[in-house]
């Protein structure tokens, strides 16, 4: 694993923005996993998790939104490369004690650059979709802890957010 860079990769020598040139890099298998959490009040969480009510519809809608967002990441993040996604997976876990939905997004590719931004975008949009579908019951929903959890592949190798 390589050490952190002492410079920002999207700025040239004069401090101007630029897209990183990946033309000379070799394609390799890459994976990134991102997480986030959506915390809400007891009423909204109860409606979300009530059998026969919202859980399936809300979480399935959030899953589809996350996949679409990962596929459009380069349209949303100005200097992000468009890349061929081999896989996008989104999982949810429920924490009844804190009324929280945990989001986990995994992206894989075989390409010249990593899929961290796609995984982070997928986790973020899944969380935003849950917010959108539950906000009628709780305007104070909190989206938190959007973060890269794991990445592997490419020159920098494997990294974990411990």
Swiss-Prot record:
Taxonomy, superkingdom: Bacteria
Catalyzed reactions per annotation: (8S)-3',8-cyclo-7,8-dihydroguanosine 5'-triphosphate = cyclic pyranopterin phosphate + diphosphate
EC nos: 4.6.1.17
SUPFAM superfamilies in UniProt: Molybdenum cofactor biosynthesis protein C, MoaC (SSF55040)
Entries under InterPro entries matching the protein: MoaC (IPR023045), MoaC_bact/euk (IPR047594), MoaC_sf (IPR036522), MoCo_biosynth_MoaA/MoaC (IPR050105), Mopterin_CF_biosynth-C_dom (IPR002820)
UniProt entry tagged with the keyword Lyase: yes
Active-site residue list: 132
Subunit details: Homohexamer; trimer of dimers.
Family per record: Belongs to the MoaC family.
Name of the protein described by the UniProt record: Cyclic pyranopterin monophosphate synthase
Species: Bordetella petrii (strain ATCC BAA-461 / DSM 12804 / CCUG 43448)
Gene (UniProt): moaC
